[in-house]
Curated annotation (Swiss-Prot):
DNA-binding region listed in the record: 37-61, 89-112
Gene Ontology biological-process annotations: anther wall tapetum development; pollen development; trichome morphogenesis
Protein keywords: Developmental protein, DNA-binding, Nucleus, Repeat, Transcription, Transcription regulation
Function (record text): Essential for tapetum development in anthers and microsporogenesis. May regulate the timing of tapetal programmed cell death (PCD) which is critical for pollen development.
Region annotated Disordered, chain positions: 298-347
Protein name per Swiss-Prot or TrEMBL: Transcription factor MYB80
Subcellular localization: Nucleus
Domain HTH myb-type span(s) in chain numbering: 9-65, 66-116
Annotated InterPro entries: Homeodomain-like_sf, Myb_dom, Myb_TF_plants, SANT/Myb
CDD domains cross-referenced by the UniProt entry: SANT
PROSITE patterns hit by this protein: HTH_MYB
């Protein structure tokens, strides 16, 4: 439920008050006073609302009110009080005898506000416009504004460097997932992915690889068992020769080695190498003794070729040379020296076959590329 209206709006007069209405209201209040504003309009014979009668009495008909223009002293008081309390018009009017809050508000909005603006003073803050502009400039432009451009440029450079060096997910190799024993390796690969870089190209390394391949091909062709089997399979009806491989298309250096190769000397050198006395072992003493005064070193049983078993001729000569060396009671020193010299000469001939540019070992292309 709302407040009960003070009068019926249908029979209420609106608009400006006439002098007759002012006289009726003034004579009634002077005689009966201001007791009940709801009954005053009816008792005074006015077709006005009770609120309208109250405002007309308070703001215009009271005997202690001042009518007319505000003095300079009153205006200065209003300006000072407004700078302190703001738009609290009732408080300001209480400091001005004979002036109502409505009169003070109307005078401020119609005259004093425009007057202050014309003087270069803000009517809200009561400060000069130049002072306000200085405060705004100080607030919006801190002392660090000179370094803002440099700082922004540095941030831009850092961001661009980050974007250029950032790897996309498509650049990362996707690790393959295997079952069984490879599950742990796959998990570790997923946890710590690696980014292998392509190895640089070195022409010198390519030349070294080619030399290694050439040495391997020469070593395979110089192996008696492999070369004999290949020759027998390739040409079973070919005439027997002293060399274990057939002369085919070969380089000039390989043809020279093919012409100087002697299988008998090769077998003799291998037999001497298997039963020769090592110099270092002879100086240190023999660990394996025979029937005679001479022994065999534990390092002397080394073959000139890794994995080579010699020829049939070397196998036949092997027991005979062993019996001769064991049966003799000391032997002829010259004969022994001659045998050693011949063995060393044959070994040196065969060692020349594998010069520094001939390497016996090679790796597949995949491992070779990775190693380079």
């Amino acid at each position: 439920m709302g407040r009960v209206p003070c009068c019926e709006k249908d029979n209420v007069k609106r608009g400006q008050w006439t002098p007759e209405e002012d006289n009726k209201l003034l004579s009634y209040i002077t005689q009966y006073g201001t007791r009940n504003w709801r009954l005053i309009p009816k008792n005074a014979g006015l077709q006005r609302c009770g609120k309208s009668c109250r405002l007309r009495w308070t703001n215009y008909l009271r005997p202690d009110l001042k009518h007319g223009e505000f003095t300079d002293a009153e205006e200065q008081t209003i300006i000072k009080l407004h700078s302190v309390v703001g738009n609290r018009w009732s408080v300001i009017a209480a400091q001005l005898p004979g002036r109502t809050d409505n009169d003070v508000k109307n005078h401020w909005n119609t005259k004093l506000k425009k007057k202050l603006s014309g003087m270069g003073i803000d009517p809200v803050t009561h400060k000069s416009f130049s002072h306000l502009m200085a405060e705004i400039a100080t607030t919006l432009a801190p002392p660090q504004v000179a370094h803002l451009a440099e700082a922004a440029l540095g941030c831009f450079k850092d961001e661009m460097l980050h974007l250029l060096t950032k790897k996309r997910p498509s650049d990362f190799p996707s690790p393959a997932v295997h079952d069984g024993a490879g599950a742990g390796a796959s998990a570790s690969a997923l946890a710590a992915p690696c980014f292998p870089a392509a190895p640089p190209h070195h022409p010198q390394a390519d030349d070294t690889i080619e030399r290694i391949k050439l040495g391997l091909s020469r070593a395979i062709m110089s192996d008696p068992s492999t070369a004999s089997a290949a020759a027998a399979a390739a040409a079973p009806s070919a005439p027997a020769e002293d060399k274990p491989w057939p002369p085919g298309d070969m380089s000039e250096g390989l043809a020279g080695m093919y012409a100087t190769y002697n299988p008998a000397a090769h077998a003799h050198a291998q037999a001497q190498a298997e039963f020769r006395y090592d110099g270092a072992s002879a100086a240190q003493g023999y660990v394996l003794g025979g029937d005679g005064d001479q022994g065999t070193s534990m390092w002397s049983h080394q073959s000139l070729y890794s994995g080579s078993s010699g020829t049939e001729e070397a196998r036949r000569e092997l027991p005979e040379k062993g019996n001769d060396s064991v049966g003799s009671s000391g032997g002829d020193d010259d004969a022994a020296d001659d045998g050693k010299d011949s063995g060393k000469g044959a070994a040196s001939d065969m060692s020349g076959l594998f010069a520094s540019d001939c390497v016996l070992w090679d790796l597949p292309d995949e491992l070779t590329n990775h190693m380079v």
